[in-house]
Amino acid sequence: MKTVYAFLADGMEEVEALMVIDLLRRTKKLNVVTVSIKDELLVKSSHNIKLYADKNINEIDFSSGDCIFLPGGMPGTTNLGACEKLADEIVEYNNQGKLLAAICAAPTVFSNLGLLKDKNATSYPSFEDQMECNNYGGGVVRD
């Protein structure tokens, strides 16, 4: 069974996180693990909803994962982007050709790491100026 690591940071958009996590878990074909980027499992959303991650970033074996998923929201996206360990692993996943997925503002994390320069990508429209990619736009982009 493939493993998706869904990263949670304080200030994330809870609908973007929980909707994706819920839908992926309902397939019963994926092992979806929610991961806090801090030592504490408790994560507060942008609307102060408290969620408990399954694990923290130091408890997972990145090599056993198949996908990294980042929900958007602010300041959640900023917090995800500031997590050096996560950034290093995103680059490694990209180098290995593993799946990277993000929604809303979170694709900017990939852009800031220089991973979208030759890719088609999209984001929440107000973040377009932060997206350094080959071709911008569209509701859903896979590249």
Locations of regions flagged by a protein language model:
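Short N-terminal binding/cap micro-motifs at the start of the first secondary-structure element
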Residues: 12-17, 42
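Active-site-adjacent pocket-lining segments in enzyme domains
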Residues: 3-6, 12, 28-36, 54-143
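N-terminal beta-loop-helix "entrance" segment that forms/cooperates
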Residues: 35-54
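Generic helix-packing signal
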Residues: 21-24, 125
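Hydrophobic residues within alpha-helices
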Residues: 19-20, 89
